[in-house]
């Protein structure tokens, strides 16, 4: 059996998903493809890495196989018996660009196992299994947005997701006359995972200091009670949630000018308040600001490198791509990579 699961890009709502906040992602037309078949032992093969790993029983290797192994462990924890299988994986999702290739791999694995063994679990349960794999087995304290989007994606729609209640709404993504591109900075600073976890701790500290159970109970008034650093972190989360709500409204009204402005202000907040951007992504966003036909841009993903999402009028980005590429190369001696992004449906059999 063969399945595919898409990556995702988040239009807006960055670092809100683990704070019970709102997000506005959509599934993208880049996928992890996965084949599953019965086997005498567990065999995991990656076409992209040209590598095969065999194991008698599931174990943690601190490698790409952990995403698959973690999913199998999560099924077993729920009492499902997963006998040995051969899983072959290939992908046209760029790694590290902020399109969430890991969640796509987890989602493809969860869906394939559920169907192959006849468990036929509902999608939401598979989302929870996939996230558990990343949090408990791989050890990255992610929110639920990435796995949710890979499962529930719908072509020509974004998903307005409340990560606290998991209530969601499909918002039409009518891009006629507009386009979304991803610029990959091709840098990943060492800080990324340690600082990501540190931001999570800081947000937990905000709640502890304020005596609140959830960020949804935090108000602007509460910010005054916080020490400086925590105040900045909390202010970002509160204002980013407001930006998501405004962005949903803008999308519904087809108001891409407003959406673009919200992207720029999201980036400023990630740079100045949450402090997770870096010189390279700041350079890209600053370069794009004020250019003809460019409506908005911001860093996407955990930060400290990765990608920048760009919203523009159709054809406008194409005109300045080379200039951006050259300016970036002159400054950082690094080549940029560009991806035009289109929406896609969620995980499915092929």
Curated annotation (Swiss-Prot):
Signal peptide positions on this chain: none
One example of a Gene Ontology biological process annotation: galactose metabolic process
Residues annotated to bind substrate: 14-17, 196
Catalytic residues (UniProt): 146 (proton acceptor)
Site residues (Transition state stabilizer), renumbered to this chain: 8
Catalysed reactions, as listed in the record: alpha-D-galactose + ATP = alpha-D-galactose 1-phosphate + ADP + H(+)
GO cellular component, as recorded: cytosol
Enzyme nomenclature, EC number: 2.7.1.6
Keyword field: ATP-binding, Carbohydrate metabolism, Cytoplasm, Galactose metabolism, Kinase, Magnesium, Metal-binding, Nucleotide-binding, Transferase
PROSITE patterns registered for this protein in UniProt: GALACTOKINASE, GHMP_KINASES_ATP
Protein location: Cytoplasm
Binding site for Mg(2+): 102, 134
Disulphides: none
Top EC category: transferase
InterPro entries linked to this entry: Galactokinase (IPR000705), Galactokinase_bac (IPR022963), Galactokinase_CS (IPR019741), GalKase_N (IPR019539), GHMP_kinase_C_dom (IPR013750), GHMP_kinase_C_sf (IPR036554), GHMP_kinase_N_dom (IPR006204), GHMP_knse_ATP-bd_CS (IPR006203)
Function statement: Catalyzes the transfer of the gamma-phosphate of ATP to D-galactose to form alpha-D-galactose-1-phosphate (Gal-1-P).
Protein name: Galactokinase
């Amino acid at each position: 059996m063969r399945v595919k699961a898409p990556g995702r890009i988040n239009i807006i709502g960055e670092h809100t998903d683990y704070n019970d906040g709102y997000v506005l992602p959509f599934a993208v037309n880049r996928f992890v493809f996965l084949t599953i078949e019965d086997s005498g032992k567990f065999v995991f093969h990656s076409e992209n890495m040209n590598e095969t790993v065999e194991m008698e029983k599931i174990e943690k290797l601190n490698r790409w196989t952990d995403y698959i192994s973690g999913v199998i462990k999560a099924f077993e924890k729920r009492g499902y018996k997963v006998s040995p299988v051969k899983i072959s994986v290939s992908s046209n999702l760029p790694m590290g660009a902020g399109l969430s290739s890991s969640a796509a791999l987890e989602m493809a694995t969860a869906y394939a196992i559920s169907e192959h063994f006849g468990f036929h679990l509902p999608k939401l349960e598979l989302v929870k299994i996939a996230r558990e794999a990343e949090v408990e087995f791989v050890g990255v304290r992610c929110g639920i947005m990435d796995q949710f989007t890979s499962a529930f994606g719908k072509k020509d729609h974004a998903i307005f997701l409340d990560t606290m209640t998991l209530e969601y709404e499909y918002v039409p993504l009518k891009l006629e006359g507009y386009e979304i591109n991803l610029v990959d900075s091709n840098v990943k600073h060492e800080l990324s995972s340690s600082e990501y976890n540190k931001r999570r701790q800081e947000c937990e500290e905000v709640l502890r200091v304020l005596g609140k159970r959830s960020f949804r109970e935090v108000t602007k008034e509460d910010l005054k009670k916080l020490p400086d650093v925590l105040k900045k972190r909390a202010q970002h989360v509160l204002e980013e949630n407001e930006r998501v709500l405004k962005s949903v409204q803008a999308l519904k009204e087809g108001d891409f000018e407003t959406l673009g402005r919200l992207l720029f202000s999201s980036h400023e907040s990630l740079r100045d308040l949450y402090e997770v951007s870096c010189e390279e992504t700041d350079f890209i966003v600053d370069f794009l600001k004020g250019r003809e036909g460019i409506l908005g841009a911001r860093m996407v993903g955990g930060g400290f490198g990765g990608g920048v999402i760009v919203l523009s009028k159709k054809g406008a980005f194409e005109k300045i791509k080379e200039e951006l590429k050259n300016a970036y190369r002159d400054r950082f001696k690094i080549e940029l990579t560009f991806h035009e992004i289109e929406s896609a449906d969620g995980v499915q059999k092929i």
